[in-house]
């Protein structure tokens, strides 16, 4: 059987009891290592789980899934995913391939950023579509997130923005030459995300959000050093030092925000007076 095991958001102890039982009995244990990261290293996981772990990069999962699924019709294979197993479509694809091979699949869920983000103080049912922000290049500045934020904002909903992770990526030159040389890992920060959002608004000029739109920067959600910083998008452009190391994400507030949410989030504000002023003018009582 193929088990998809969620590992939670932070460290080795976030795995569920059921998930740990699966990992301990499985013939092989894989760790998906490119859609997100835990805040501890592979050796720490192996020590806690009492099992060797094979790191599965994007190439293995997307191009060599037969190795992961090898003999899974006869033995148990654990495919471990940071957060919840179905936070990325790649894992749906792995399940579909397993089904084609007649392999049974079972999921062991866990907390993900989609649920853990509630710690920022906003009600989860007031979130709209989640969007992703990738690193801009000189000749590539994808802005599909903008229209989704526009839809969310039109009905007063918050937007969770998930930030880019570059792990085991190749430069165009190395890719073209077929060289297995990889760039150092890169993790987008809230500051970069906020700046890129404002650049796209400057281009679009549709007033979906602006420098004084309220937002929350989130760092290491679910971990011991979890951190939230709230302020305007302009303020968050310079908030990386306050937030600290990765992983980061960002929430753009919608106008359907309750007073209790305001009071909760206000405690994270870079400038409480500025936060109160904008809240009263643009958010309080608005839909």
Curated annotation (Swiss-Prot):
EC number(s) recorded for this UniProt protein: 2.1.1.314
Keywords: Cytoplasm, Methyltransferase, S-adenosyl-L-methionine, Transferase
Binding site for S-adenosyl-L-methionine: 9, 84, 87, 112-113, 163, 221, 248
Top-rank EC class of the record's enzyme: transferase
GO biological process: methylation; protein histidyl modification to diphthamide
Keyword rRNA-binding: no
InterPro entries named in the record: 4pyrrol_Mease, 4pyrrol_Methylase_sf, 4pyrrole_Mease_sub1, 4pyrrole_Mease_sub2, Dphthn_synthase
Gene3D superfamilies from the UniProt entry: Cobalt-precorrin-4 Transmethylase, Domain 1, Methyltransferase, Cobalt-precorrin-4 Transmethylase, Domain 2
Compartments, as annotated in UniProt: Cytoplasm
PANTHER family linked: DIPHTHINE METHYL ESTER SYNTHASE, DIPHTHINE SYNTHASE
Family the UniProt entry places it in: Belongs to the diphthine synthase family.
Protein name (Swiss-Prot/TrEMBL): Diphthine methyl ester synthase
Taxonomic classification: Eukaryota, Fungi, Dikarya, Ascomycota, Pezizomycotina
Gene behind this protein: dph-5
